[in-house]
């Protein structure tokens, strides 16, 4: 990840521990706004680059998810009230492919995996006012659509990789093949 920082990428909520392509989340980190739980959190970790207009963001990652809601994947962040995160989230002991679209309040959708994935590839394609999220498992291409969502067009966003531990003490994720 050092090479990304040298090419203009930056941290939003930099974690205490990261090296190479590996990030260990800090405790009590998350991105969420209001829905169901009633709280607002803007403390998760993002390593991203500022992008305006259309783009495609793809990353492959693997994490040692341990505790409820441990999560890793991609993020597209306009501001604290407008963002998307998608990846794996550990829910009730199982890995879920997850997408949260937030426009003032968070809207969460999941697909339960029958078996834990060794790795996940997530692709977010921003075209005009739309972000399409697709995924692939265990080395497969991101060919399965998870979510099609409205997102404000043309505005510059922070786009990159994300991880967080809302409840747990932290876990480690390795990000590979990051491209935008």
Region spans (language model):
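Extracellular glycan-recognition regions
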Residues: 1-180
């Amino acid at each position: 990840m050092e090479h990304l920082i040298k090419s203009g990428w930056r941290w939003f909520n930099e974690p205490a521990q990261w090296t190479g392509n590996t990030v260990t989340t800090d405790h009590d980190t998350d991105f969420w706004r209001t829905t169901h739980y009633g709280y607002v959190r803007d403390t998760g970790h993002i390593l991203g680059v500022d992008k305006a207009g259309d783009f495609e963001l793809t990353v492959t990652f693997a994490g040692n998810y341990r505790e409820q809601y441990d999560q890793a994947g991609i993020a597209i962040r306009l501001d604290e009230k407008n963002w998307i995160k998608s990846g794996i989230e550990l829910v009730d002991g199982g890995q879920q492919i997850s997408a949260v679209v937030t426009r003032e309040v968070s809207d969460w959708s999941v697909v339960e995996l029958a078996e834990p994935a060794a790795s996940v590839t997530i692709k977010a394609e921003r075209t005009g006012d739309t972000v399409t999220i697709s995924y692939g498992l265990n080395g497969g291409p991101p060919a399965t659509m998870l979510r099609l969502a409205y997102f404000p067009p043309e505005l510059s966003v922070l786009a990159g990789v994300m991880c967080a531990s809302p409840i747990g003490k932290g876990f480690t994720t390795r990000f590979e093949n990051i491209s935008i």
